[in-house]
């Protein structure tokens, strides 16, 4: 086998787009000054290319990398419903029809509700504020660790800061698709480690109603994650008459049958 110079081997992997023949230059050629002729310019390019290393290694500062990194593995399929827990096909079809009507109404009246003045106590968090959105949707009382006792606030009316703001149309109409996806992720993360609550259910329904189709990949992954988590929690519910069962069934139904994730659908009872 003939010996191939290292430079030739590199050129085989990175061929020249414009082959350049050796240039006849004057003895006074100085590569440190601007080129005066096309030949001097091409020769200068050759010299600079020869000085480039064959392999370049990026210097990465580990401190600048995100400390908290996660990988979401998408597993297919929901846990089958326990016997007697699965809704009928007719019930599922009715929910899809009603949900479609809600989505159309939200879309039609979005500009109207977006223009409505929010109450003075409503301050919507920024899109990237995960903790802020959890408190906004679920309330500071539920988000506070160990805070299970009744509120000591004796003022009349409902303290939404403590119990969470409901997904009013005047609120969700102000949320763009990026914010809707972010809040869906924040609440899904919360739900992944905790039980189902009515507050979660209301917000999940409202966010799904505002989620535009076709789904972006991130939203697609999130709603599948939501349906699977609902099926996991349903397995732990002790009675089919528990009020959580129809709410969990509804979310699984909407994800699977409205958003066309049919592999997650419940088999009709």
From Swiss-Prot:
Gene3D superfamilies according to UniProt: 1.20.5.220, 1.20.58.1070
UniProt KW Transmembrane keyword: no
Pfam families, alphabetized: SIP1 (PF04938)
Modified residues (Phosphoserine): 70, 155
Subcellular location: Nucleus, Gem; Cytoplasm
GO CC terms: cytoplasm; cytosol; Gemini of Cajal bodies; nucleolus; nucleus; SMN complex; SMN-Sm protein complex; spliceosomal complex
InterPro entries (alphabetical): GEMIN2, Gemin2/Brr1
Keyword vocabulary terms for this entry: Cytoplasm, mRNA processing, mRNA splicing, Nucleus, Phosphoprotein
Record text on subunit structure and interactions: Monomer. Part of the core SMN complex that contains SMN1, GEMIN2/SIP1, DDX20/GEMIN3, GEMIN4, GEMIN5, GEMIN6, GEMIN7, GEMIN8 and STRAP/UNRIP. Part of the SMN-Sm complex that contains SMN1, GEMIN2/SIP1, DDX20/GEMIN3, GEMIN4, GEMIN5, GEMIN6, GEMIN7, GEMIN8, STRAP/UNRIP and the Sm proteins SNRPB, SNRPD1, SNRPD2, SNRPD3, SNRPE, SNRPF and SNRPG. Interacts with GEMIN5; the interaction is direct. Interacts (via C-terminus) with SMN1; the interaction is direct. Interacts with SNRPD1; the interaction is direct. Interacts with SNRPD2; the interaction is direct.
Similarity section: Belongs to the gemin-2 family.
Function: The SMN complex catalyzes the assembly of small nuclear ribonucleoproteins (snRNPs), the building blocks of the spliceosome, and thereby plays an important role in the splicing of cellular pre-mRNAs. Most spliceosomal snRNPs contain a common set of Sm proteins SNRPB, SNRPD1, SNRPD2, SNRPD3, SNRPE, SNRPF and SNRPG that assemble in a heptameric protein ring on the Sm site of the small nuclear RNA to form the core snRNP (Sm core).
Name this polypeptide is given: Gem-associated protein 2
Species annotation: Rattus norvegicus
């Amino acid at each position: 086998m003939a010996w191939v110079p290292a430079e030739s081997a590199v050129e085989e992997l990175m061929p020249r787009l414009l082959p350049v023949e050796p240039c006849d230059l004057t003895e006074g050629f100085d590569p440190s000054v601007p080129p005066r002729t096309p030949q001097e310019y091409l020769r200068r390019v050759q010299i600079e290319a020869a000085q480039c290393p064959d392999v370049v290694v990026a210097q990465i500062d580990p401190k600048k990398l995100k400390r908290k990194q996660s990988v979401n593995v998408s597993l297919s399929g929901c846990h089958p419903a326990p016997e007697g827990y699965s809704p009928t096909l007719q019930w599922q079809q009715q929910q899809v029809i009603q949900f479609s009507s809600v989505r159309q109404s939200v879309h039609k009246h979005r500009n109207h509700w977006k223009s409505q003045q929010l109450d003075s106590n409503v301050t919507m968090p920024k899109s990237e504020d995960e903790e802020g959105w959890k408190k906004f949707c679920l309330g500071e009382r539920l988000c506070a660790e160990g805070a299970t006792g009744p509120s000591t606030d004796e003022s009349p009316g409902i303290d939404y800061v403590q119990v969470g703001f409901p997904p009013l149309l005047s609120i969700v109409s102000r949320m763009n698709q990026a914010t809707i996806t972010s809040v869906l992720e924040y609440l899904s993360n919360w739900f992944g480690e905790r039980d189902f609550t009515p507050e979660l259910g209301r917000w999940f329904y409202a966010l799904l109603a505002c989620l535009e189709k076709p789904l972006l990949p991130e939203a697609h992954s999130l709603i599948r994650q939501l349906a699977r988590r609902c099926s996991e929690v349903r397995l732990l519910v002790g009675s089919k008459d528990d009020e959580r069962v129809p709410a969990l069934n509804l979310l699984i139904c909407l994800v699977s049958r409205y958003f066309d994730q049919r592999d997650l659908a419940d088999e009709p009872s």
